Amino acid sequence: YLQTKKKKNEFEKLLLASAGPYLEQGERAAAEMKASSYEKLRQRADEEGAVCHGEFSQHNILLENGRGETAVNFDKWNFDLQVADLGYFMRKILEKHGWSERAAERILNAYSARRPLDEGEIETLRLYLSYPWKYWKLANRYYGSRKSWISGRNTEKLKTLNAQQADWLRFVKGSFF
């Protein structure tokens, strides 16, 4: 649709111009996930009844003065690998910190101190972080929306995402994991 559209707005031009690297990385991550131990891990998680928050970010964690932490807003809970919540959390934090390997290491060390990850979970986390979730979300929202009006906020999000692309790809292809 977008390629044949004659008059494109700024968002559409940006979306189309930036699609290549995100599609390539998404296909690579999906193929690697399919070839990984993800399905075995997921089956094990199903048998154990593992529950995920579904939207585990810093906004959904309450720190209670010396009494610990509380997770809130379980609207998107689901049955899945718990490492999916860690991946979501890390992605949100790393986007705000330039995909810093140091920040990733600190998060992973803190998590592992309470719940160590096995090799398959670490590989799943790496693949989760290498998928272009934010680009997919913006493209999917565009595809499912009225095309006559595009939110300026989405255009800004796409510009920010494209500006962070090199840092993200460096992190994904780097030696962190």
Regions found by a protein language model. Give the residues of each.
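Helix N-cap / loop-to-helix initiation motif
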Residues: L117-E121
